Amino acid sequence: MDDQTEAKKAPQGYAVIHGHFYQPPRENPWIEEIETEPSAQPYHDWNTRITAECYLPNSCARTYDGPGRILDIVNNYEFISFNFGPTLMSWLEVHAPLTYQRIIDADRKSRARLGHGNAIAQAYNHAILPLLTPRDRETQIIWGLRDFEHRFGRRAEAMWLPETAVNYPTLAALAAHGIKFIILSPYQAKRVRPLAGGSWQEVQAQTLDTTQAYRCFIPEMAAGDPGRRNYIDVFFYHGETASDLSFGELLRDSYRLSARLTEPFNPEKKRPQLLNVATDGENYGHHKKFGELSLAHALAHVLPQSGFTVTNYAAFLEIAPPKMMVDLALGEKGQGSSWSCAHGVGRWQEDCGCSTGGQPNWQQKWRGPLRHAFDFLNKQLAVIFEQEGAGYFRDPWAARNAYIAVVLNRQPESLEKFFSQEGKPGLAPEDWVSALRLLEMQRHALLMYTSCGWFFADLAGLETLQVLKYAARALQLGQYFSSEPIESAFVDRLADAQSNIAAEGNGRQIYERRIKPVVVDFTKIVNHWVISLLKNRARQCPARVYHFRVECLEHDVKTQASIDLAAGRLRLTSGITLAVRNLAFFTAHLGSYLYRTQVKRELERSEFVSLQQELFAVLESTPENLIPLMAKRLGEDYLTVHDVFQEEKEGIFRDLLQPNHEEAVGAISHHFGEAKSLLKAMAHEGLTMPRLYRAMGEISMNRRLVEVLRQLEPEPEKLSESEELLELIEDAALLGLKLQSGEGAGMLQRILTHHLMDLSAELSEKAARDMYQFLALMRRMPITLELTEAQNFFFTLMEEQFPSLAARSGRDAETKALARTLIKLAATLFF
C-alpha cells in the first residue's frame, strides 16, 4: 500500500457503507413463482443468478493472502448497513435459506456489537412514495415495517425509501410510525442551519457536509400532537464516492476503496465524523465481479487497522446526534426528489429526460399515460374495495394494512387470527373467499406501482410488462365484484402510451398481445395438471400445481389408434384466496406435443359419466371423429401445451427430444471411440485436434463420466480407486477436453456433501482422509466443483475445534494424525 492510497488514521472517524439490496419482482402473479428466465442462463432466473453472484458471496466473503489462500471468511452483512427489499427477502427465505439466515444472523451480531442492528426496513414493494395516495403510502410503510419485524425480530429504526424518493408528506408518514432516520442523496438537501439558531445556508451536493447527521422538521406535523416527534434525522451519503464505487474502479482494490471513503475526514474537527456511502448492494459481486472481496477486506482489515470504527447509522446517531437542521429539495415541480432523477420524481410519471438509454431517439412519453391508466384503475378498485369490503371487515383499509400478516404466513391459524381481529363479527368462513379476493385485489394494486415499471427505456420492457401483469391480476379479482367493464376503460387509457418499438405498438396492443394470454384461471391449472399426468403416467397424480391444491375425484385414460383420451373430475383450491372449483376435463393426446384439453365447470357427475362414455366409445370405434365430437359437445374453446406453465412445458419438450438425444450421443460416442487412439497419438505429437472431434470428444467423455459416477455414487469411498475414472481424467487432460456435465457436477456435489456430513457427524482421521482423497482427485479433474459451502463449513469447524485439537496433538498420536490430515484437507480447500 503506497502513501497515496493509505487511509487516514482517525480516532474520531466512523465508516458506514450502506447496501440497498433489491431486485425487480419477477414472479408470475397468478402462481406466485418465478418461471424460467432464459436471459439469466446458466441460472434458472435472475434472482438465482444474482444470489450466486452477490447475496451469497457477501454472506461469506473471502480475504486472501498473496498466493491466493483463504485467510478469513467474512459475513459482510455484519459490517455494512443494509436493507433488503421485502419481496426479495421472501424469495431468499424459500430459495436460498442459508444466505437468508446469514443475513438475519448478521443483524443480530451487529446489534450485540454496536447496540443497534445493521438492517433497516424498506417500503414494501419499491413504489415511489411521494407519488402514491396517502392511503397507499401508509400501507407501503406499514407492510415494510411489519415484514422487517417478522424477519429480524425487532422494530426498525429506519426505512430505505425506494429510489430515495421523498417529500414532506412522506416524512410525516414515516415519523408517525416511529422512524428515526432516513438516508438520502446529497443532491436532495436544499439548505442547512445550526439547530441552535442562525441563518440558512444554501447547499449543493459538493458543499454539503456529509460527515454529520441533520434534523429535518416536518411542517405537516408542526401543529400536531405535542407528544409526537415532528422531525426525522437525515444522513446524506457522499455522492462522488458513491458514483465512483458504482461506475468506477474502486472495488478492484480495498485500499483504494478505504482511502476514497475516508477522504472527507478532517482531523481538525474535534467531533465524531461519519464517512458514509450508499449504493445498490448488487455492486458488490454482481455489477462488479468479486466486489464483495474488496468490501470484506476493507471492512475487516483496512479500515480498522487505519483507526476507523466500522459502524452503522443508528449507532453513530447515538454518539453524535444532529447539531444542524436541513430543508429538503423538492424537485422541479415540488413533488419530491430522488437519487435517480435530476428533475425530482418525474422519472416515474413523465418523459423528464432521465433514462437508462436504449436506442438513439427513443423517448419515454409512455410513462405519463401508463401512470394515468394505473391511477384510474387504482381509484376504481379502491371504490370496489371500500364498498364491498364494508360487508366483510370492521374497517376495510385497516384490514388491508393488517393483511401483511397473512401475506407472510398463509397457514390456517394465521387466517383465523386475521379474520377474528379484522373481520366483521360473525363473519363465516365461507365468506373468507370473497374477503381474500378483495385483499388480493388490493395487494396487486399496490404491486403494480413498483418503480421498475417506469424506470427503464421502453413500455415493452420486462419490468413494465411485470407491472402490467399485476394490474391484470388486480383487474381479474376486481371483476368478481363489478358488472362494469373496468378492463376496457383501463385498456383505452393504455392506448395513449406508445412503445419506441414499432412492432410492439401502443399500450392497448401490448396488453392484448403480451398480457391477456398469460392470465391464469382454473382451466389452465386443470390443463397443466392433466398434461403433466399424461406425460408421465407412472408417477402419482400431482397433489399441487404451484399454490393450487388438486384433489382428483376420478379420472380414466383410454388409448386407441395412438390417441390417448383422459377424462376426469378435479377439485381445485387456491392457496391464496381459498376459492374452490369442481371441474371436469377431457384431454386428447394425439402424439408428440399435441394435446387438446377442454374443461367444463360444475358438471353434474351423471352428465360427466355420459360424456365420458360417449367420447370413449367414439375413440374406440371411429377415432377420426373424436375431435369433431369434442368440439360439438364441449364447444370450440380448448387449451394446448402452449397454455402449460414454463417449467412443465420445457420438461415435455425435453422428454420428447430425449430418444433423439440418446441416439445422437450414442452415435457420436461410437465414432469418437473408433478415432480415440488416433486422436491420442495426435495429442502426443503436439498436433491440434480437429474442431469436429473436439466437440465429439467432449460430448462422448461427459456422457461416460456421468455413467461412471452413477455407478460410484452409492459408494463414494471407492471413487479414488476407480481405474476407469482415473483413465477418463487422464484422457481428458491429454486431449485438452473439458468435463462440464451438469449432471456429473451434481453427483460430485452430492458426494462432497456426503463427506461433509460424515466429517460433521464424527471428526475422525478416516472421515477427514476420505474427504481429502476425494478433493485431491477432484483437483485432477477438468471439472469445476463448487466449494463455497464446503469451505464455509470447514472454516467454522476449524475455528471451533482446531485450537483444542492442536493442544492435544502433542500428547495423543491419534489426535496428531487427525490434525495433520486436517491441515492437508485445508490445503485442498485453498486455506
Locate each region found by the language model.
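Acidic, His- and aromatic-enriched active-site or binding-groove loops in soluble protein domains
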Residues: 101-118, 142, 154, 175-224, ...
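Active-site and substrate-binding clefts of carbohydrate-active enzymes
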Residues: 3-64, 87, 200-534, 561, ...
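Extended alpha-helical scaffold segments
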Residues: 678-831
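Extended, Lys/Arg-enriched charged tracts that mediate electrostatic binding to polyanionic substrates
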Residues: 92-96, 187-189, 193-211, 216, ...
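Core alpha/beta catalytic barrel or barrel-like domain that forms the active/cofactor pocket
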Residues: 113-128, 151-160, 183-189, 232-241, ...
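Beta-rich nucleic-acid/ligand-interaction surfaces
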Residues: 163-170, 189-193, 318-322
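CE4/NodB-like, metal-dependent polysaccharide N-deacetylase domain
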Residues: 137-161, 224, 262-276
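Short, well-structured secondary-structure segments
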Residues: 14-19, 23-134, 139-140, 157-161, ...
